[in-house]
Amino acid sequence: MNQEEDTVNLQIFVPELNVRKFLAVTQNDFIWDVKRKLLATLPQALPQAFNYGLFLPPCDGRAGKFLLEDRTIRDYPFTDCVPYLELKYKKRVYKMLNLDEKQLKAMHTKGQLKKFMDYVQQKNNEKVEKMCSQGLDANFHDAQGETPLTLAAGIPNNRAVIVSLIGGGAHVDFRNSEGQTAMHKAAFLSSFENVKTLIELGASPNYRDPIGLTPLYYNMLTADSNDQVAEILLREAADIGVTDMHGNHEIHQACKNGLTKHVEHLLYFGGQIDAENVNGNSPLHVCAVNNRPECARVLLFRGADHLAVNKQGQTALHVSHIVGNPGVADVVQAHNPKSSVPYRGTPQYSTRRRLSSTITRRRSMSQSSICSQDVYRTPQSVRKGPMSAAPSPSPSRSSRTTITPSEYGTMRRSGMDSMRGGGMIAAGHETNIARILVIPRGVKGFGFILRGAKHVAMPLNFEPTAQVPALQFFEGVDMSGMAVRAGLRPGDYLLEIDGIDVRRCSHDEVVEFIQQAGDTITLKVITVDVADMSRGGTIVHRPPTASSRHSLVFTPTPSAIYSSTKASSVYRMRFDTHDAHGVDYYAPNEIRNAYSESRHASVRQRPGSGRRISAAELENLMVRQRVPSVQGSPYQMQYDQESLNGGYSSKKYNSVSDMKRRKGQRNVVASSAGLNRSTFEQAAPTTSTFEYNCSSRSTPQLSRMDSFDSFDDEDEMPAPPPASYISPDLQRDSSMQRSEYSRPFRPTSRPKTPPPPPPMQHQNHQNHQYQQQHPSLPRSASTPQPIQQQQSSIPPPPPPPPPPHCEPTMVHVEFTPPSTSSVPPPPPPLPPISSGAPPPPPPPPPGGLMHVAASAPVLMSNSKGISADALKSVQLKKAEPRETSAASVSNNNNNNNNSTTDFQMDLKNALAKRRSKVAHDVDEDEERESRFEGLSLRETVRENVVERGKGIQNIGIVNKKDSGYTSSRTSLEPSESEEKDHRPHFSLDHSPNVQRVTLISQHLEDNYGQKDNMSVASSSTASSSSTVDLTKPGCFVVPSHVIPPVDYDDDPDSGTGDSDGEIRCSEISFEHKKVDVWSVDDVIGWLSSLHLSEYTPAFRSQRINGRCLRQCDRSRFTQLGVTRIAHRQIIESALRGLLQ
């Protein structure tokens, strides 16, 4: 059955809110999941929402009824084109024809209801049946929050009353005020007769309470539990592998309470013998802690791993000695793994229950699927439960879908389970065989966590092997998501995305491919057989995390991957003298931060396919479109676009002191903030090898736009290859790069021009590179020979300040034979600059672009920024109309070279049409474009900066939005609200009357440095960064306090309700104070630097200053709203670092 036939459009009406909703669900969706999806979309929360049910009104002579929550949509055939349901509070459905409303009202007084509860308590079956026959509705709560059915289920051997209640209209799944059903109550109290009666009357063994626990789990919570209750629940196909908020399974609780027979039943019906909780403790560890030698003996006899270690590196034997339980230690020491006898038979289930699509035959996989040799692992259930995530802040996590490879049996999936997956699942689900999965996008995304090597900037000597077939793998899979239904399992390696080979791609590239997918995504994955996997050099067994505690995850070691902390464009280059030093992986805390609050994986698609693009994005796009065609000329260094757009950065610091320490270790020369940065490292083609990694795809490189990570001012870009090594296709592709994780911006107005001509002969390589670094200077006709002789020993001269002209003029650079020219050649290189003397001013650009006072020196210092004196000397040319701009471009081209070809003119004209004036607003998206050469005054100096008195504003760059077009989050489940995003943003202003100055200087470093995810790309650049001098030519550095930083707002307000300037000031001030003297604003700024701005309202309302912050403990942080352990640990760790 195809996807369209499986989809059902439901029309659901909510009478309490007078709301009508339309939901598209599949035939295999459980009623419980449909109800939860509906409750999440309601504008107002309903009280006791767990007691609301989907009601099917009477139709075609059939009485209305509430749909059972443990069944699927397929079990309820609908006759209408658009099935109609109602979400109503569960009440008795009367089938009597002669109803007297007055009599019913008299039956439901407080006195009558109290009397009815007394009859239930006294087991007076006749009275209960009589009152129900008179029309009393048994679906109500007493003063203690109990229902008549839950009260009756708690009384031993109360079969008659239970039958009378359910026969009298009581819903079997009606919950008490704590969200527990009668089945939960009977299982907890080990009332075997009551559990049996409820099951016979149609109750499900898989009801969930608000935290997702089942009756089977409840049965393991007491030491005097009856094993017959567990057995009958398991025979009715109860879910196994349900965990609480601490990650404890049923078998953990059974071992804790010494329930030996329960452990036997759980193992026989497929329980995971070596399941781990959040601390990494297996059931054997629990036996060691609680001194349960009998349970430990059963576990070892059935194949438990006695060498399994927890997250503290302790085995069960270690734990038993530490706690002081010699009984368990003796059992473990005396155990011989060869004597283990695991269960190998298939369990028998009850034939009375209809095992249809409602309850899948999840134990169809043979129970002989046990791990090889002395490590035995019982197989997991293939069945996906209907309610793996409960509507509570502490959702349950089910691990029963993890499949362990085996040498004894072949893993098989039942046909019904394959139907429920909804995707193309390979028959048999064998290991080491690639399979194709088609995963539809659900409400929470696709439902997986991707993990692997990040930011591959250099070519990898990685060849896929049988053990490590790809760089990216799936760390976790949402047990209630679409991926697990399609057959995806934790630990699977990703081979292809929509037919594109991604085995050697970095994490960012793969994320972009996933984000570009539509409503469905086709993945080619493979499950690696753990038993055949080598434990040596190429595989690392990563410790289990909260999202994949029960799956073996293997990762390529750093030795197999080059250092990949800097993003490349299309090419990836490798220097022969460089060594690989490691690779970055997504840590669990980074994954949680990146995906907000949720623990299930998803890659969200930004709403709206045709979203507007911000000015900063256009600026960076135009900068990247400046692809050099001159042989040997370097690429211009790209702007920190991801930081400007407020995109998430994967590099985090544990504390402010850690940030400062690590920044100090990487203290390299910084390029002038906001200026067009160029690299001066010249690598000869003979000493470097450039490799290009282009994935095969059916269309030319248009869809692939590599993401860029933030470049710190102190990082150096690896030298890009000469243009002679770059094919025209690659050059075109490099102009299409982007830096967002969101839906890619696909420009439709891209000028359709032929590729640039092949470069001329390799001559004057050094001079060409110098001219490309200064595109505003026309090419000299001849270059003095001593320049090339001195290049090896004398540093190249510093670049001049960029011409701050307002018109988007284009400078044409061409290779021409040496001839006489009136344009003066560039001056010879300057001698080395001493530490105390400033360098001489650089050569001026041609006249007409800008005017610099001859007396204004270019200051240099040890900090970053632009000096005020340098800014005073800048005189800007006034803006000209668009026609004048186009004419000037044409005139310049004609003056430079008369032999310009037609396609070059077309290219320049097309590019000129895409650019607008800096200080004029024109129509919406087409006209909101900016300079392409990195010389825009939005990045350096605004127009008419001499009148800075009315332009400079002390506005911080923190908490600024980019008109809502910031980078998407690379989340499990990212937050939908843009208003709650407190991460730094940067935007550009197009107002024609505002004159401002932007210095992306030390403040940017302080703010975005905490999110720095870049490091030196190779060993050579790392070594050079430690010896470079801050007075190196080509870098303008002045104290950051000369001119206060401002930013350009697209939005008048950040939307947070707080003053951005106050937050900025607080971030500056708290770093120079002791914690004891911190004010409330200092604490708020400190929290913002830790990316924990969501707690600032509570800290501000409680007036938490530095002294109070030092006295905060766990309970105090909880009162302030810091309930997440990871966030509290970040705060405490950072605070300890400051105090030390």
UniProtKB/Swiss-Prot annotation:
Residues 388-412, 761-775, 784-793, 1015-1028 have a biased composition (Low complexity). Residues 977-988 have a biased composition (Basic and acidic residues). It comes from the Eukaryota. GO terms for molecular function: ionotropic glutamate receptor binding; synaptic receptor adaptor activity. SUPFAM superfamilies: Ankyrin repeat, PDZ domain-like, SAM/Pointed domain. The keyword Secreted does not apply. One of its GO terms (cellular component) is cytoplasmic vesicle. Residues 351-364 have a biased composition (Basic residues). Its main location: other. Residues 337-412, 640-673, 687-856, 875-902, 961-993, 1008-1028 are annotated as: Disordered. Residues 640-657, 687-704, 964-974 have a biased composition (Polar residues). Gene3D superfamilies: 2.30.42.10, Ankyrin repeat-containing domain (1.25.40.20), Phosphatidylinositol 3-kinase Catalytic Subunit, Chain A, domain 1 (3.10.20.90), Transcription Factor, Ets-1 (1.10.150.50). GO terms for biological process: defecation; rhythmic behavior. Pfam families: Ank_2 (PF12796), PDZ (PF00595), SAM_1 (PF00536). Residues 794-806, 823-847 have a biased composition (Pro residues). PROSITE patterns: ANK_REP_REGION, ANK_REPEAT, PDZ, SAM_DOMAIN. Disruption phenotype: Animals are viable, but produce a reduced brood size, have a prolonged defecation cycle and a reduced pharyngeal pumping rate as compared to wild-type. Reduced male fertility which may be due to irregular male mating behavior and defective sperm function. Reduced cell surface abundance of the L-type egl-19 calcium channel in body wall muscles, which results in a 20% decrease in Ca(2+) current density. In response to the nicotinic acetylcholine agonist levamisole, there is reduced expression of genes such as gem-4. Belongs to the SHANK family. In contrast to the mammalian Shank proteins, does not contain a SH3 domain. This is Protein shank. It comes from Caenorhabditis elegans. The gene is shn-1.
